[in-house]
Amino acid sequence: MKPKNVPREIFNPFTNKTSLGTRREGLFLCKRLKLRPDNYLEEYCADLEVIDIMAPIRPADETERCPPTSTSDDQEAGDYLVSRNKKSRNSDYMLFSSDALVHIAHDAKVSEKYTWLGERLRLTFKMMRSDSRLIRTMCHSHGFMQCSSKNPSVNVIWMGAPVKSVRMRELMPWQRLNQFPRSTELTKKDRLYENIERSKSIFGESFDFIPEFYVTPRENRKMENAFVRVAKEIAAAGGELCFPGEFIVKPTNSRQGKGIFFANSMADIPAEGPLLVSRYLKDPYLVNNHKFDLRIYVAVTSFYPLVAYVYSEGLARLASRPYDTSASSADSNEYVHLTNYSINKNSTSFVRNESMSSEDLGHKWTLGALLRYVENEGKDAKLLMLRIEDLIVKSLLSIQNSVATASRTNLRFACTNFELFGFDVLVDQALKPWLLEVNLSPSLACDAPLDSLLKTRLIADLLNLACVPLLDRKIIDSVTPALRKSMNSQESESSETDDLELDPMCAKTLKRRPVGLKRSVLNKKIVSGSTSLIPNNEKKFDQIVRKAELEDGRRGDFIRVFPRNGTWGMYSPVMEDLGNEDFDERLFDEVVTKKNTKNSSGSSKASSSSASASSSSSSMHIEDLSDLFHEVMMQCDKYSSIADVPIEIREIISPWYEEASEYTKKITQEGETYACKLPVIRSTARLRTKSCAEFYEVRKVQLAKKKESEAMASKENEPIVLQAVVAKRI
């Protein structure tokens, strides 16, 4: 161990010079940089003898960039970092704001309000297998420079397709990647359904939110028996087969509604696969006689322990033609029974919502507009959202074991990963939500004004949850070689024990756990294989705790659904054991229990209400309460409103129920002006490296040639008479 006060070189960002100093002097410099205790990056770089890694937001002696004037626009120019969430702290991490897009256009009066900080620190991002205009616009509007996909040292990496888990081992502690390893366990349709079905076989009807399903070709025999059984059941009841089909068939790895069709027999199923064949839900809840589904945006910042958020703003996508199960609708199957926007926008009946003020116009509504419609129908919309939150948490828990195992192996540093999922949910007549699929990198296209407003806010809040560190490029360049050397040496030292630590049987033990096997017995089987490749698990856990506390002030319009008050007691009986660290329970104690204790100590009202809640539920064991809770979540006919919910459960979920009112709010405010589309970025703010700029130039030429060839091909295919008429007019 090195002595603490041995003189060494310390970089001072105030003077841009390196001088000889001691660790004590370095810590003093950290105070000048306002390095907070929750900045976990200090721990990594302290081992590399780099103390002052965080760049200051603004030195005390820096002069104002914009001279004060009497106009409101110029007065606004003094606020360089603005957030919709007033609780956010902006000293160590970048604060993203949807307001920044207003100042990135050519005609912006205050052009450097948000870009100056990113440009000064030379923050960078790259996009791989994605060309989302919204992501590029958001990053450029905060001063980020776009790099080529081959650059390994960028601050933010945005992927549009699955990343190989081994590539995540190269992530540095200051980098942010929008994916977790093995998240395809959730986003591939067959794996999603199989994971939830496995959890259902272990924990029972608590996971009853997916329809009956089969995966071809490996389950062809079971599927054939299912077709025969369904036909017999319908014949015995004197009914007819559902039109367009009793089963709906989807490719397991497709999106945007591609390749979907209906089936009533094995003859309708092609031999090639794999395909997901699931029971068609033929009694959907209708809005103005139209079928719909919900797009719910979910952010995850950690899988072990699980930290999950649901965005308070979402979308309701309506079918473009009225719902009809008769054979007369055969000519418009897809526009009646499918709700995918990419399909229905091609229908002649599709109505676009071009208004910013009307959230329930056309065939794409906001989530809040649909929930207000449900409330006007006399239904409990907030209880519906609690059931959707429950569905989301259980879906994430069903893959937690797989993702946690991969994360231990491939994520060297805490808090480098985050992910945005798009949950597609169908609601039936009993107001029971059913999970259809989960989308990896959900569409961020802004085809309508409400799309632009909602998704711009969504991405700003998502990046705030990611906590992108404010690091000067000089610091990164100086630290990276030493850190990579340390990582490589750790890799070589751990290679000798890889066989023990990566035993695949350890990861699969829980999947094969028989129903009724006690966890204490199961734990004994996996203790020997629970060692992680990353040594300091406790330090990583402490970092996750600090980041989770920080996220609470940076979440914007996200609602944390796990962990929060009551979640540990309700969900721990349906959670798999991931090791003897108990990170989920400990995070709940750190983030929820201690916070409640601190808040209740100064409020007699809070303590009295807490006492009444505990006394009313003390007569029931925690596992009995959990069973009753999951019964309430699944049996929507029996518990159709909050008044029908037993008092013991109502006291637990009442804070959730109150918070669910955030989903029903309008996303626009009267008197406010909103941009109807993404701005065109001015050239001075569209920062790109040379290689990245060359890539876009080449692509621009290729697209122009492709467009020209398509125009020539269409012209050659025109009828001769039409060409003659056009020539005559000319």
Swiss-Prot record:
Gene3D superfamilies: ATP-grasp fold, B domain (3.30.470.20). SUPFAM superfamilies: Glutathione synthetase ATP-binding domain-like. Keywords: ATP-binding, Ligase, Nucleotide-binding. Its EC number is 6.-.-.-. It catalyses: L-glutamyl-[protein] + L-glutamate + ATP = gamma-L-glutamyl-L-glutamyl-[protein] + ADP + phosphate + H(+). GO terms for biological process: microtubule cytoskeleton organization; protein modification process; response to hermaphrodite contact. Residues 594-618 are annotated as: Disordered. Pfam families: TTL. Residues 120-478 form the TTL domain. PROSITE patterns: TTL. GO terms for cellular component: ciliary basal body. InterPro entries: TTL/TTLL_fam (IPR004344). ATP binds at residues 278-281, 291, 293. Expressed in body wall muscles. Not expressed in sensory neurons. Residues 600-618 have a biased composition (Low complexity). GO terms for molecular function: ATP binding; protein-glutamic acid ligase activity, initiating; tubulin binding; tubulin-glutamic acid ligase activity. The keyword ATP-binding applies. Polyglutamylase which preferentially modifies alpha-tubulin. Involved in the side-chain initiation step of the polyglutamylation reaction rather than in the elongation step. Together with ttll-4 and ttll-11, required for male mating. Probably by regulating microtubule stability via the glutamylation of tubulin, negatively regulates axon regrowth after injury in PLM neurons. Belongs to the tubulin--tyrosine ligase family. This is Tubulin polyglutamylase ttll-5. It comes from Caenorhabditis elegans.
